[in-house]
Amino acid sequence: TFPVGAKLDLAAGREYMFDRVYRQQPERFYTTDMHGVDWDKMTAAYRRFLPHIDNNYDFAELLSEWLGELNVSHTGGRFYPKGQSEPTASLGLFFDWNYTGKGMLIAEVVEKGPFDTANTRVKAGTVIEKIDGVEITPDADYYTLLNNKARKKTLVSLFDPQTKEHWEEVIIPITNGAFSDLLYSRWVKQRAADVDRWSGGRLGYVHIESMGDDSFRSVYSDILGKYNNREGIVIDTRFNGGGRLHEDIEILFSGQKYFTQVVRGRETCDMPSRRWNKPSIMVMCEANYSNAHGTPWV
């Protein structure tokens, strides 16, 4: 092996990418008139900003503004920087931000988080006093104490204001990405509880997280499993980023009962047995994107 050095002309690289977008759009745009936009004129209007851009954050914004003139979805520019130099871990907790004393007052322990275990004494109302021996003062930002702590054993010093007891526990913080997944599950569980309460147990609830296989399998399992005997189902598609699932969803929720199987005088199942045969309603919002935007219209 031997060392090799290279000098990159970043400005020339951005100009190349700009020109590539300019050439490709007329060839690939879904209508030949490009929504009536004079592409050459529009390109010239945005090209004049190019010499003044010295970073990829701004370059991505330029591409997005330029392509946005076409007034069509699924276009734009994105810049993905390298990962954080010091990613901050999560304890899987919500805190009471009105609390003004020392430490952090826990408002909620998130289900399946680091403190949601059988051997912890932490609960809502517990105060975290220290993290790895560093005291949390009212004017301190406790997040810095969790830098680079994901998946690493961390000592947490705790206090119960009711019993006046102090103790310590060792936990393993999770990444913020993992915490986001827990918050999503928490949100779905809360929405399902709302529907169950408001309908008096008559309706089920499922959320389609994305238009992909994993989401479909989860929805399929719930509607033909725990919600199989409900009178109807609420299908929530809000905040779904898309994929390609509209045909599968249409088939799954458009079943028409044609037969009821009876065994020894008892109804055992309806046919089709692998499709939803009862009423359903689909919820959407402005944050639905791509295939998730189109699916409610199917």
Predicted regions and their residues:
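Cleft-lining beta-strand/loop regions that shape enzyme active-site pockets
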Residues: 11, 15, 26-30, 34, ...
